[in-house]
Structure formats: structure tokens, C-alpha cells
Amino acid sequence: MFSLKMRASRNGNHVSGAERLVNEEKIEKISSELIKRAMSHENGVPDFINLKIEKVTEKINKLKHLEIKTVHSTSKENSRNIARNLLKNELEKYYLKNGKDIEKIDELIDFAFKIIDAGNMRGAAILDLDGNRLENILERGIRVKNIDTTEELSEKILKDSSLTERTVDAIAIATKVVNCGVISELCTSDNFSYTTGYVATKDGYFRILNLKDKGQVGGRVFFVENSKIDELYDKLENMPVTVY
């Protein structure tokens, strides 16, 4: 197996990124698809594209995908309240476990929304329960690497007309993240026209319509219990995972 990693930018601003795990005979085909994806991105034609291909020598871990649940909402305000409640329900368990003030959870979630609304990060921000950012490089964040979905799962998802390639990408990331010890994830898309975002916890992948406005940037935040950041980085970046 080979890991393919694509990232594209324009004037130093992140435009697109994608990860795939493929057999040798598919490298050329998938590489072409990733470059085409970067060049046709709605956020603009990039002036820089990096495509990295590496042989994977470690065992591929197979993970069952999180259950996909779609939450319908017609306003950004309502959608964000839904996301907030999903996050609070999960975070509260860890606040109580660690003897922390649950009244501080809203502040943590406010900070997370501020991060994703600022956008222009290639990867995700990581927040501990005290609101500390734990990424090695704040402007870059952490990229979840060495991931893919099986062809069967991809085909199953895309048979649903309400789901897209973005869902396929996101379910791979969310499933790996939750299985690496992240409490929950909050995400909105980089694509200006795509307003659906999600919250992921061990209970599922919750697609929430209208989580941001059209034309708005996107971002990703991981909530973690402890600060074993080196171990988390190693898993998220290096552990090969296929989601089925």
C-alpha cells in the first residue's frame, strides 16, 4: 500500500487537501484525481500543489465507520446550538471525571467556534479541557494522515444523494480521530458554498446542515482530555487506517 497526500494553497492560504491509501497499480489514477480536485476547487486555482507518495510498511488498521446521522436545521444559529449541545453532552463527562467546572464548557466551545470561523489552517486545532491549544505549530494545526475508506463504504455513502465526497473524506477523519482518543471533533468545510458541518463523538458522526454561512471559511477542532500530545500526533499522523 502507498499513502498519497495532497495539499494545495493560493497566496499562502490553504485551498484543498486530501489523503488516500492505495495499491501500487492505482497510484497514477488516484494521483491524477487528487491534482484535478485541487485545480478545480471552488475556492480558486492554487498556485502551489504538493503531492507526496510514500510506501506504507506498517500494518493497516481497519476501523468500523462511525454511524452517520444527519441533523436538519434551517439557520446557522439553531445549527450551532445543536452542535453546542452535542459537544456539551460529551465534554461534560470528562469535566466531571477530572473535577473541572462544567460551567466552563461553553467558554471552551465558544473558543472552538472562534477558531473554525477564523479559518486558513491546513490542519486541526487541538484544545484540552482548560482551553489550551496543544498544536506544535498553531498556524498549521495537525493533519490527520494515512487514512482512507474502503471502496464499498465510499460507494455506499455516495448512493445517498444527500451525501458527497466530502462526507467520504470526513467519515474517514472522524472515525480515526475518535478511535485515537479524541473526545469530540467540531468541523466546518473549507469550501465556501458548502455549509454543512459536523460534530463527531464515539456516539456517531452528526452532519449538521447550515453550521456556517455561504462564503464563510471553515476549520476543524479536536477536544482532548490530556496533554500527551506527542503520542496523539504520532497516531493521527502515522497510524495507517482504512475505514469500512
From Swiss-Prot:
Enzyme Commission designation: 6.2.1.14
Record HAMAP family: BioW (MF_00668)
Catalytic activity: heptanedioate + ATP + CoA = 6-carboxyhexanoyl-CoA + AMP + diphosphate
InterPro entries per the UniProt record, alphabetical: BioW (IPR005499)
Gene Ontology molecular function: 6-carboxyhexanoate-CoA ligase activity; ATP binding; magnesium ion binding
Cofactor(s) this protein cannot do without: Mg(2+)
Keyword entries, A-Z: ATP-binding, Biotin biosynthesis, Ligase, Magnesium, Nucleotide-binding
Assigned protein family: Belongs to the BioW family.
Residue ranges crossing the lipid bilayer per the database entry: none
Protein name, as recorded: 6-carboxyhexanoate--CoA ligase
Lineage per the UniProt record: Archaea, Methanobacteriati, Methanobacteriota, Methanomada group, Methanococci
Keyword Transcription included in the entry's annotation: no
Cited NCBIfam families: PRK01322.1
